[in-house]
Amino acid sequence: MEKEKILEFYKQTSQFTDLGYYKDFAKNLPDDIEQLCILQRMQIIHPVAFRDKEIRNKKDCFWGDMTKVPVTRLEYEDDIFPTSQSVIAELLRKNPNYTTKREAKDKVHVTCRSQAILLASILKSKGIPARARSGFAEYIHYNGICYDHWITEYFDEKENRWRLVDADEHCPDHEMEFDLNDIPYDKFLFGANAYLGIRQNKYNPKTILYSSDPPILGLKASIRGLFYDFHALMNDEIIFLHMPKYIQDKKFELFEEEYKELDNLANLMLNSNENFSKLQEIWNNIPKFRIMSGALN
């Protein structure tokens, strides 16, 4: 019974994943996960690529003719397209042909979070339980550092199990040691694992990195991953600016009792399906975990 409850929960959408009038459009996209990821990847330019001057001067690269992309475009368009619906609406506004042939000038510049929630949204539109997941991945550069990253997790009904998939990394110039459509769970460091690993001195703080400018390392980075993932597990895929206000106000310097509260949350998140009801209880009864800071508050 609990399993059915969980699967039904992750078929539901949030203000970030609801596609509104674009639900039927998404429902008719390819069912094959590889085709779906490649198609989605070709609609998007990662902001890190857009800000690279060498890439910006290329007429023929993976991203397309980058010389035709106006320099006035925002590097990080996550600011203006925070929801899956807004991403699809902008893509179709620029060019209604949603194909792998989309020109660079008609793509949007968003990060892994948008890739993760967009894929989750499309899968939900097809009636497939799906959720965005936040954490850290060493496979971004294979240099020993785990960079903050978002991926998608969905339930494979045929195999009766959850799968991890990374739409953002479907790039031909990035070779992986595993299948991006079925990522081994030990290859992705979820927010809770990173947080507890730092608390227990399992990880060198310098190897857990949140890609702000300047970068945030260690415990403070892991707290971000912890809360991004907790909210995602509750179908609330908050944007990067959102973080519990009490933590932001304290500049991520907490009392030991407050860290112990997070220890409890993180330990439950290690097995989010088994502890789903307990996580929902925390969600419903500890408002400080949900009162967010943002750009204007």
What residues fall within each predicted segment?
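Active-site neighborhood of thiol-dependent amide/isopeptide-bond enzymes
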Residues: V69-W150
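His-Asp-centered catalytic microenvironments across diverse enzyme cores
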Residues: K5-S14, C37, R41-H46, R56-R73, ...
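A short, structured loop/turn motif at beta-sheet edges
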Residues: D31, K124, E157-E159
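Secondary-structure boundary elements
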Residues: E2-D106
